[in-house]
Amino acid sequence: MPLFGSIFSPKKTPPRKSASLSNLHSLDRSTRELELGLDYGTPTMNLAGQSLKFENGQWVADSVISGGVDRRETQRLRKRNQQLEEENNLLRLKVDILLDMLSETTAESHLKDKELDELKVTNRRRK
């Protein structure tokens, strides 16, 4: 007989109970939230006295910054400003291209007018 006997030998574990008998695991997330009331709202936290809220995949300051303007509003205005600057740059480029095209056609027109005048002069000399 061993010194410690069968005290240290692992015993067989009892078989596990079957999986959950409820059908909640087969429901989609929104239905489960309605059934179980799992609507937690948006996550918020405080860091160094500043309140942050998780919106659209980013942590956004929930508090109002100096001057009474909301941080989300300033972000929206910056984004709109950048869009307008890009549009303005595109329009300037289009104007430059149109001016180049106009100067090219004007130069061609002047050359053709000059050539036509020369042909008229040579035609008069022949007569």
From Swiss-Prot:
A GO term (biological process) for this protein? negative regulation of canonical Wnt signaling pathway
**Tissue-wise expression:** Found in heart, brain, lung, liver, muscle, kidney and testis. Levels are approximately 3-fold higher in embryonic and adult heart than in lung or liver.
Q: Coiled-coil ranges per the record? A: 68-110
Q: Which Pfam families match?
A: Chibby
What superkingdom heads the lineage? Eukaryota
Cell compartments where the protein resides = Nucleus speckle; Cytoplasm, Cytoskeleton, Cilium basal body; Cytoplasm, Cytoskeleton, Microtubule organizing center, Centrosome, Centriole; Golgi apparatus
One cellular-component annotation, GO:
ciliary basal body
Per the record, residues carrying Phosphoserine are: S9, S20
- Keywords annotated in UniProt: Cell projection, Cilium, Cilium biogenesis/degradation, Coiled coil, Cytoplasm, Cytoskeleton, Differentiation, Flagellum, Golgi apparatus, Nucleus, Phosphoprotein
* Disordered: annotated span: 1-25
Q: CDD domains, per this entry?
A: Cby_like (cd07429)
Q: Its biological function?
A: Inhibits the Wnt/Wingless pathway by binding to CTNNB1/beta-catenin and inhibiting beta-catenin-mediated transcriptional activation through competition with TCF/LEF transcription factors. Has also been shown to play a role in regulating the intracellular trafficking of polycystin-2/PKD2 and possibly of other intracellular proteins. Promotes adipocyte and cardiomyocyte differentiation.
Show the PANTHER family listed in the entry: LEUCINE-RICH PROTEIN, PROTEIN CHIBBY HOMOLOG 1
Assembly and interaction partners = Homodimer. Homodimerization is essential for nuclear localization and interaction with KPNA4 but is dispensable for interaction with CTNNB1. Interacts with polycystin-2/PKD2 and GM130. Interacts with the C-terminal region of CTNNB1. Interacts (C-terminus) with TCIM (C-terminus), TCIM competes with CTNNB1 for the interaction with CBY1. Interacts with FAM92A; this interaction facilitates targeting of FAM92A to cilium basal body. Interacts with CIBAR2. Interacts with KPNA4.
Q: What remark does the entry add?
A: 'Chibby' is Japanese for 'small'; the gene was so named for the RNAi phenotype seen in flies.
Q: What's the family?
A: Belongs to the chibby family.
Protein name (database record): Protein chibby homolog 1
User: Which organism is this entry from?
Assistant: Mus musculus (Mouse)
